[in-house]
Every structure is written in C-alpha cells, then in structure tokens.
C-alpha cells in the first residue's frame, strides 16, 4: 500500500447542533500523485431527530435521495423509498405489528395475528395466503414441549410440521412434505446447553457431534443408514484462547493448521497435510496495518516458466484510499466468460499470469474491469442508470439501454444480457431462470426455485427435446440434499461440519466414483473451496478464483466428478445458471454484483455493491452485509451455543415479573428514567458485560481499536443498545426471552458486529449515533465538556477512579489537582445529588462507566463543527507508531 495514495485523505463527519451526523466527507485517491476527489454523503433529519433522507456522493445534487424514510409519531418506520429497491409502505397496528403493506410492484400485503400477536397468515390481497402458521395451545402435549410453539407451516413449497422441541426451543423432530406428498422426517438431539448432539436426517443417516469443555466442536461422526457403525469425519479439533480454530484432523488423516498473528489475531498462515507427506495446502498472508490483504503466497505451488513468464503462484492486491480493490494479480488458465453458466475444466497448457484493474464511480459501482494477459486479455464495462445504482453490461459506442426493461420496480433484474430471463415471486425471491427459449413449440428449458421461511428448500432443472424431458430435482433438508434425476438416480448429499460432504447413491453410483464417497474441502480465508479430497486424501479437483468470484483455474481429476462439485466461491452453491445462491440474494460473479437490491438496506446506500468492493477482506454470509473475515466472522463463528446463551441472558435480562406494572407507568416512563432504574441498570450491566467481551475480542483483531478501547466501545454499544431494547419492551410489556426469535438474534448480532466494524474503520458506531441523542438530560454537562478535552490516559484514569467508587466530582478534582489546575464550582448541590443517585457500583464494567461519562450524548456544537475525539487520537498515535498510511478520522464527541 503506497503512502502517497493515502496522504491527506481523512474521513470527516459533520454534526448538527443536535449531534446528528449530517455530512460524511471522504477523499478518494486511487493512484500515487493524483488529486484526491472529495466525496460527500448527506443525511437529513426531521425535528424529532429521525433520519428522513440520505444521498450518496453520486446523487448528492439530485432532488431524489438514495433513500428516504417516513416515520410514525412514535418513531417507527412507516415508508421506505429507495432509488434502487423501490418503495414500501407499512401500516402498523396498536402494538407495532405490521398489519398491512403496500409496495412498488402494486402488491397489497395483509398479515393476520392471533391474540398473542403471533403471525398466523401472510398473503396478498385477493389471493390465497402465501404462508399460514399454526401454534400449539395450552392443551398440547407438554412432554414434547409443544405449548406455544409453531407446530405447522404451510407455504408454496409444501408443509412443515414440528412434533417435538427441546427445553430451550430447539426443534427435535420435523417433517417436510413437498408436492409429491412424500414425508421427509428429520430428528435432532440437544444437550443441556441446546447444542446439537446428534442428527438423523430424512435419509436415515446419523451424525454425532462432540464438544470440548468450552462448548467448541471437537469431533464429528457419521453412520450411514446402510451401515451398522459410525465413521470419523472429524477426529479432533483444537482452539486457542481466543476461540479461534488452530488445528483440525479430518477423517482422511489430513491435518489442517491455522496460525494467527498474536498482535492482532489475523490469519497468518493456513496449512494442510498428511503426516509425512508434502503439504496439500500452504498459504501465507500479508496485510496492511488496517487489515486489507496485500499478498497471498502459495507455498505449495511449483513455479513454472511458460511463454517467457515466471508463474510463481503468488497473488498481490492494491487498494485506493477508500480501501476498494483497484488491482489484483495472479495466474489463470480459464479466461472468465462474460456470460452466465458454470465454468468448464481448464487447459493446464494455457497457464498465464494476469493482472486485473478495477474502476469505480463515486457511488461505489464497479464500472470497468481491464484483464491484462499475454493471450486472451479483455476489457469489460458497466453502464449505471443515472437515477439509481442499477447497471448493465455495456461497451463504449453502444446505445444506452432501457433500464426499465431489465429491472422491475423493486430493482430485481429481469434479464441477464446475452443470457437467461429471471422471474421473481411476490416476495422478491428468484422464482425461475429461463435457460433456453424454444421456438419449436417445446417448453422452455428452465430452473425453478421454492422457498420456505426465507430459505431455498427446492430447485428443479428441466430441459426438453423433441423426444424426451430431462430433469434434476434437488430437495434441501436439515443436513441433507436429495438429488433425483429422470433416469432414476437418487443421490443423498450429506452435509457435515468441517466442510465435508458425503455422496451416497441409493443405487449404483456413476463410473469412476465410489459410493459413499466423502469429499473434504480445503478452503481459503474466505471459505472458497480450493481443493477437494476423498477419504484417502486423494485429490478430486483443484479450483482457484478471481477476487470477485469468477473461476480462474479448475482442474477436476475425472470427467465424472465435474457434475458433483456444487459448492465453490465463498462456500456458496453455484446453480446451472452460474448464479451463486447466498440465502437472501443471488450473486453474478461475471458482473461482480448482485442481481437484486438489498431489501435489508444494511450494507450502505449502493444496494447492488458486493462486499464493499473489497472481496479479499470481506465475506457476505447471507447476501445482506459484508463482514470482515478475519475478525467478526472468526469471533462469532466460534460461539457454538449462541442460541442457548442468548436465551439464558434474555431470561436474566427480563428480570423481575412486570405483571403488576401499570399501563400509566409504562406510558410515562422516559428512557433516561428507565436507564437509571433497577431494570435499566440491570439491562445495561448484562448487555455491557457481553458487549465488553465482544468489543475486546474485536479489538484483538483490529489493532486500531485495541483490547481496552474495544472493550469500552463494546460495553457502550452493548449496554446502551441492550438497555434501549429493554426499555422499548418494558413500554410494551414484552419479555425478551419470548420475543427474541432467530431473526431477531441475527439482527442484534449484526448490530454489534456493525458497531465493532465501524470503530475498526474509524467511525462512530451507528447504534451509538442513533441512540445517544436520547440521553441528553445530564446534570454534569460542565464536567463532561471539560473531561472530553483531556488526553486519553487522563480520561481512562478518570473512568477508573469512578469505577472504584469515587464520585464524579471527587474523580474530577483528583485529576485536576494532579495537573495543578484551579477548580471551578463544578455543580450545584442538586446536580451532585443527581450524580450520586446513579453512581456506578464497583462491579460495573468500564463500558458502563463510559456511559456515565457520556450519558448526555453527543454534546451540542454549532452546526458544521468538527472535533477530533480521544478514540481517533489513540488511533492516530497507533498509526504514527506503525507508520500506517490510514486516513485520519474526525468525530464530534469523545467516547
């Protein structure tokens, strides 16, 4: 990374008098010596402090913002309008539930609830319900823990019934029926902490899982339905003190090792080998100071000279001042086609070095890719809709396309240029891909998808000739994929932990493939499948990828194995269309972008951009937001019992019974009063404890944060967000343990992850920006205004003194006495009394103390003022010490 690229490219944030961020200014430079371009992102708020509009740098002068919001009087979102994803309007009920919804596709949605505000039906007006839910009542069988649980779901994919639950709510037995009326029953056994101990899939194959004392997965066994004993799939696994996987021994005796930099927790090397044999995989990683991958060295690659070139197997990467990938080099043997479809096997004789250059517009759209290669180079461009971020393949001189023909009003792409047509269902899920249109009266070749609860559960590929119809049907079940063909073949693909898949044919397997073949995948840091091995550690296939997911090299060991590799880039399944299924969306690797807009609006204002245009650092687990692979994913991936831990915390979080709390008390309770009540302090303490641990762990991965600062910020995020959530639940009389289902847990986890990531990138976490303004009534503004001007060490000493039981006044006087500065009158007697009533206990976390210091929120300043805070100061000190060319960040107030 060149220092000159990052010289004088700060990131600035401008706040208004309420402490709300109204401008974010970034400076872009992509080459040494070039002038930095100023990029301004704008936000607008209503009088209540709620955000109502946002403009990215590309649309900064437009009349229409990228996103606009209309809120109810209570602050709930009523309408969201996006230039990428269209508009959606929600009519909430008295308890905040979504009763009716309208959208830009002309659909009027109706939701029906029972007396406990549980959804019982969802559908479009004038049509049968798309989803219906059935819940067990008080008369249900208590021995199977059914009472209050959802026991049946009917949707377009068929029927799902749940017969038994664990004590902590895990589904122990479920049956799914598709349109063929064949029941598929899956069973799970849970431990006392709700971890899965055993799973029997719909094919009768049984997985057993064993854990160490810390609850981390240690061993995995598999017993096929036709076998009488189990075989080891994962023989052993070890973890370091931070919970990171450091060693795993597979059932094929391949030992994989992960080494991490002790200074920051980043992956330093990845190695896999059978004892006494040459390494099968050995990568070494080089990073810049902020965590961008600069170089990947392949130590197992044998350098070759070909066509007057040295091909050494290493890969190098360059970035602009916004940390977007601008250059990548490596080697390939399969120039990426500019069309849909699966990759074809490579010709090893065509191996060459390549260099790719990437250009972006001010909205973050990748508009040009130049692929430099001795033979087979190319340049590809995208034309972006002037009024949105919708884009299409285009070359200079081509007429401008009609974007309305290629995208619907919700931003779903209807046709891939020079490729298939895409059809979307009412829920904006890809329903059908037309692979080939027949003009001779035959039905079109197509692939059709069905979903349940937001996840794909079935796909069917059909192709037609004049004499016959061929099909491939895939059913997705817990731990199992059932793949059937028109020739009678039925393949059970058993998915196991440790990146292992077992191929079990009910009848005779294809030639050159053993039945019950175990396929072990050796992945890179992004989870991409690079090397497939069988149970004897023999190589089945090798594959490498370009940075944005296209296949650069694919060498299968036999033609028979070609059709049975489905999981590829980033550990995702590639369909016959060439699209990757991520869960919430589909990704087109040849376009380097999603084919539908991000309906969650979680990953920035560009709803089509892929992993912040930094695909070597970020991964997207489900198609909603890019996360740093080396920090957040490792952090949350090692938590084996998230669901049970969240349930236990939520139960304690709820605290005492609230049945006797009057409605008038709930109605008049303010957030500040609640925060300093017993319930509020309990909620903050519990949430801050969890947040401090997460923040500290995040700090170990991001040196700009540091463990202590990470813990403080994590405590502040966790405590404040948790207390606010508990306050809202208190106002409505809802218990967290009942309300936090899987989707909510995912959203809360992502909020914490986003907060940690914001800090790592030198920004105030969004959750703090959104919530701190509600804590503005403090009795000690004078003290805090002065404390925030101190250096970070004095601030930490001040926090420690309060943590030890000293009052705010005493701690302030002690620091000032140490500096031999005359003390002013600090507070009136009433203010002092107010401080003492909320004085923290000795056992409270430092994150809670920081909240005490900042409970007045982001201090009011004249609009447009910019100040550098303590966290940024510490980050700058770190950068000076490491000489990191990181852009400086300025904030309005101090943590």
Feature map (PLM): residue ranges:
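Acidic/glycine-rich beta-solenoid
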Residues: 31, 60-71, 84-85, 105, ...
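Carboxylate/His-rich catalytic cores and anion/metal-binding grooves
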Residues: 40-55, 164-165, 471-493, 531-553
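A motif-centric feature for acidic-aromatic and gly/ser/thr-rich catalytic loops and repeats
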Residues: 510-583
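Amphipathic, membrane-inserting segments
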Residues: 736-857, 861-864
